[in-house]
Regions:
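Non-catalytic N-terminal targeting/anchoring module and adjacent flexible stem/linker
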Residues: 246-307
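Catalytic machinery of carbohydrate-active enzymes
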Residues: 1-268, 294
Length: 307
């Protein structure tokens, strides 16, 4: 059987969902997974057991649902058997469970929706094939030698970035920015991260990778950039950095109203919902209303890295 997955972006969400796909793969199913092309380099070799189908992004947002459904048709995937892992698709509310938005965090929701035990989220190591040569090449590019002292930083998320306050680091500790585009695959950074004294990350794909891989070695510092329900459940021992960003965001979804929508018949026309068939703009077809940071990240926590 072929199993399609609807989670075309972002990279952090794809990493969160990989153990879900692996659970179905181990049942003997073929996984067909359309993703936005900018993430393809990270997974095409490291996760070769998935049939990845890279897609171009567009202003209409067709890569959320319309393009994946076309890809499923081409690959003979039954859309009714696909895993729809977005937290919320506002033009297709029948695909989600809005009643659970106030109960589960977004990563818990993906596992609940797919019927996979949440504890498997932290088995990412079993889902990927590391490339030691690529990891060594990256160390060489960065000029890292045995015994070098360094910390890694990742201060960019999908809709958030912060400057690195270098003055708060021990001057003897070199800062290496994981956000620099030095390699096609995020997994090539694993060796560098494992050798670091510390890793300082905003909530991002890099932080998700470190957490889900159970990276041991660096001290871990995590910076929230979203309201509580849109942050992942962390499994490693992180120091959570306080910020003045709001804990709660205005309600994005009215569960009662969405339950009514879901109860209404949603005709499917050639693999598309009625809303799609009507040619509506899908640019707002997102998993949630994007959070816009209203505060700023304090920098005093950086003193924790001083010797």
């Amino acid at each position: 059987m072929k199993r399609g997955i609807i989670q075309s972006r972002g990279l952090g969400d794809i990493l969160i969902a990989l153990p879900i796909a692996r659970a179905y793969y181990e049942r003997g199913e073929e996984i067909v997974w359309p993703i936005c092309e900018e993430f393809y380099g990270s997974v095409k070799d490291s996760v070769a057991w998935v049939t990845w189908v890279p897609m171009k992004t567009d202003d209409r947002g067709s890569f959320f649902l319309e393009q994946p459904l076309k890809i499923f048709k081409y690959h003979d995937v039954d859309p009714n058997q696909a895993l729809y892992l977005y937290h919320y698709l506002n033009v297709a509310p029948e695909l989600t469970e809005p009643e659970l938005f106030n109960i589960l965090k977004f990563d818990q929701y993906k596992y609940w929706k797919s019927g996979v035990p949440f504890v498997l989220k932290w088995t990412l190591e079993l889902c990927i094939t590391r490339d030691p040569a690529a990891e060594d090449s990256l160390r060489s590019t960065l000029g890292i030698k045995q015994g070098d002292r360094y910390a890694v930083v990742s201060m960019k998320g999908s809709n958030f970035s912060a400057a690195v306050p270098q003055g708060f680091f021990d001057p003897n500790v070199r800062l290496i920015n994981v956000d620099d585009n030095l390699t096609d695959s995020i997994f090539d950074w694993l060796g560098v991260i494992e050798g670091a004294e510390a890793a300082v990350c905003v909530d991002s794909a890099v932080a998700n990778m470190i957490d889900q891989m159970g990276v041991v070695g660096p001290k871990l510092y995590w910076i929230r950039r979203s309201p509580w329900d849109l942050t992942p459940v962390l499994g490693s021992t992180w120091t959570i950095i306080p910020t003045n960003l709001p804990i709660k965001d205005p309600v994005r979804v009215d569960p009662a109203a969405e339950a009514v929508k879901k109860a209404q018949p949603q005709p499917v026309l050639q693999g598309r919902t009625a809303a799609q068939a009507n040619g509506g703009d899908q640019s707002s077809l997102t998993s949630h209303v994007p959070f816009k940071a209203a505060g700023k990240i304090p920098t005093s926590f950086m003193s924790a890295l001083k010797k």
